[in-house]
Amino acid sequence: MSLLTEVETPTRNGWECKCDDSSDPLVIAASIIGILHLILWILDRLSFKCIYRRLKYGLKRGPSTEGVPESMREEYQQEQQNAVDVDDGHFVNIELE
C-alpha cells in the first residue's frame, strides 16, 4: 500500500489529480482540523495585541482595599499615580539634524 494519496497523471487536456482515498474519514478529519488550525492561527495573529495586552495589563488591579480607611485608599491611589507620572520621564526625545 502506498503512502501517497494523490497521483498526477498526464491526460489529453493537461495534468489532473486523481485522489483515490479522498472519501476516507481520516483524510476528511485531517483536512478539517488543518483548516480550523489555519483559521485559529490567523485570528490569533490578528488579535494578538488586543487580547494579550488586555490579559497582561487589564487584569492587574492591585491589592484589595477592603477594610482600609478611605484616607489610606486615597494616599495609595496618589502614590500609584505619582509612580505612573515618574515613569513618563524615562522616555528620551532624540532629535535628528
From Swiss-Prot:
GO cellular component, one term: host cell plasma membrane
Transmembrane segments: 23-43
Site keyed Essential for channel activity, possibly by being protonated during channel activation, and by forming the channel gate and the selective filter: positions: H37
Protein location: Virion membrane; Host apical cell membrane
Description of activity control: The M2 protein from most influenza A strains is inhibited by amantadine and rimantadine, resulting in viral uncoating incapacity. Emergence of amantadine-resistant variants is usually rapid.
Ranges per topology, Intravirion: 44-97
HAMAP family: INFV_M2 (MF_04069)
UniProt protein name: Matrix protein 2
Protein's organism: Influenza A virus (strain A/Equine/Jillin/1/1989 H3N8)
